[in-house]
């Protein structure tokens, strides 16, 4: 801790700093709470996303029994090709994060007379699963970025609560004591000088 100047100017500076810290701390604490809430929201979204994937897998399993041979899964895979993953950006509690918009698939034609009628349903189910997984990756990235900001904000809250504010209050206390002692000493010296002067005048 830097050595404190024991002056009235330093006292004013420390008081001003304390006011600033105490004014800024609630904003940091609120941001910390918002970030914690958003992280919980991300976890809820991931849980819901995983439940949707499981439901889609169950729907796909219904078509698996219709696959007439070992080539059917490959025929489904051949009908699926990702063209683009659409994302944007969003601001969550002051954090810039990616936002999932969807997955675009290439339109791969097939011979409707050669393929079984259930193939389109199986393709749609697999596409849905892929889209759900891509969305989950984006949510996980949101969680990671929000977590980084939460760690930084928590460090700043701790710095204010445990270091800056207590340190500034202690500086104010030390300066006030020093100024009080100096004022007391000045009064004592003044009285001594006055008595000495009165004694000299009496002797004359």
Predicted stretch roles:
Residues 1-204:
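Charge-rich amphipathic alpha-helical interaction elements
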